[in-house]
Amino acid sequence: MTNWQQQLPLTDTQKNELDKSVLRYLNWNYKQTVRHEHAQDYESVRHAIVTLSGFLLQESVDRQEFISNNDTSNESMVDIDELLLPKKWNSIVRLQKKIIELEQNTETLVSQIKDLNTQVSELAQFKPTTSNGTSAHNVLKWIPRNLPSCLINVESSVTSVKLHPNLPIVFVATDHGKLYAFDLFNYTIPLASLQSHTKAITSMDVLFTNYTNSSKKNYLVIVTASKDLQIHVFKWVSEECKFQQIRSLLGHEHIVSAVKIWQKNNDVHIASCSRDQTVKIWDFHNGWSLKTFQPHSQWVRSIDVLGDYIISGSHDTTLRLTHWPSGNGLSVGTGHEFPIEKVKFIHFIEDSPEIRFRTPSTDRYKNWGMQYCVSASRDRTIKIWEIPLPTLMAHRAPIPNPTDSNFRCVLTLKGHLSWVRDISIRGQYLFSCADDKSVRCWDLNTGQCLHVWEKLHTGFVNCLDLDVDFDSNVTPRQMMVTGGLDCKSNVFMR
């Protein structure tokens, strides 16, 4: 055996078949081009193919195929595939692409397995106390894995997302004014969809009522705000999987930026803020506007409610605390350099003395029911503030503390590279999303960024949601959902 035969990774039979395939392709190409376009070269090309076959092919039977007249009517040529070589070539390219895709999928699955093994190790350290076998402490310490469990696509950019408090359903609002409900275990098509507004939905909130009066049936309420200056209130009919509109709230004179719905005893109220610089309080049951006040000199971007108090963030870069039943402004926070996109109260949670900001530092704050709040801004920072105690008087509305009416910034979180759009707090973690296309998880105890999800969306990340940890009517689940400008919503589940 010669040296070149040793280098060739083919048996004699395989080499013979390869040579025949090459000659057949040359023969086919000669018949298609030379015979019709270069007739003068017909004989010379055909002679070259015959000569080459005699050189490459040892068996006379194999050579006879090319010595014959190459007529397609020849019976010996009927079962011969002259294009076998280019077909194999194309198949190899497709297989290489498929192999690359499979390798990428394998890397993804290996990463998910590692994340799951880590979660199993963490679960083994805690005693199960919940119905699903997971300790409540561990649920609040959950950090989503690197890749989402499912991906939901809609027709336009996602402006707001909310998880159903009890069921595996996510509600998605879009820039085209559409409202969707998706089953997280079968998300190929929505459970329900509704053109709820004529312009973009800017905000959404949900509440599962908890009436103590047995004559009233509890159900899920969904409130949406829009650029069409309207607020719509819907009931989610679980039996029929549909949105049932209850009423519309009209009164704002410009874009409605945000809405919140909450229940105190058997009373349900809705708060809204607008570019008309006002905040309005509405009675859910009759739709009446109970209170209107103007806490800022510019566009009010965001609000949050805790009992009788509302915190608001504005285009004027400040956040303010207001006692909404009286309309009294109590305190103000200054420190952001650009408009504030989101504000939230930090609720106290029981039996968590090791978590910073989640327990009151004094009995006065404990009796008041709040102490800290958080704001996210276009200046790329997230700030946590201590709220000064107002002057509280029996049977009278609170008034500003004459000696201390300014928020005190106790922690600033830096890491985002663009506007911070939304925030959510669970346990000792704060989750944030921004226009830098990333989602971040921060440790409230240390102020450090623990994890960054950088490739969830191809555009701005507009919103996110997790189950709250302070409502006894809501069992926190290990779930997180995000929505972005790329018309996608990512869902993370344990």
Swiss-Prot record:
Function: Positively regulates the activity of the minus-end directed microtubule motor protein dynein. Plays a central role in positioning the mitotic spindle at the bud neck during cell division. Targets cytoplasmic dynein to microtubule plus ends, thereby promoting dynein-mediated microtubule sliding along the bud cortex and consequently the movement of the mitotic spindle to the bud neck. Following plus end binding, dynein may be offloaded to the cortex by NUM1. Required for viability in the absence of the kinesin-related microtubule-dependent motor protein CIN8.
Listed CDD domains: WD40 (cd00200)
The WD repeat ranges on this chain: 153-192, 196-244, 251-292, 295-334, 347-395, 415-454, 457-492
All residue ranges annotated as the LisH domain in the record: 14-46
HAMAP family, per the entry: lis1 (MF_03141)
Name of the protein in question: Nuclear distribution protein PAC1
A Gene Ontology cellular-component term: nuclear envelope
Disulfide bond sites: none
GO biological process: cell division; establishment of mitotic spindle orientation; microtubule organizing center organization; microtubule sliding; nuclear migration; nuclear migration along microtubule; vesicle transport along microtubule
Pfam family, one: WD40
Keywords, ordered alphabetically: Cell cycle, Cell division, Coiled coil, Cytoplasm, Cytoskeleton, Microtubule, Mitosis, Nucleus, Repeat, Transport, WD repeat
Compartment(s) of residence: Cytoplasm, Cytoskeleton; Cytoplasm, Cytoskeleton, Spindle pole; Nucleus
Quaternary structure annotation from Swiss-Prot or TrEMBL: Self-associates. Interacts with NDL1. May form a complex with dynein.
InterPro entries (UniProt xref): Dynein_regulator_LIS1, G-protein_beta_WD-40_rep, LIS1_N, WD40/YVTN_repeat-like_dom_sf, WD40_repeat_CS, WD40_repeat_dom_sf, WD40_rpt
Similarity-based family: Belongs to the WD repeat LIS1/nudF family.
UniProt source species: Saccharomyces cerevisiae (strain ATCC 204508 / S288c) (Baker's yeast)
Family matches, as Gene3D superfamilies: 1.20.960.30, YVTN repeat-like/Quinoprotein amine dehydrogenase
GO MF annotation list: dynein complex binding; identical protein binding; microtubule plus-end binding
Chain coiled-coil ranges: 90-123
Recorded domain comment: Dimerization mediated by the LisH domain may be required to activate dynein.
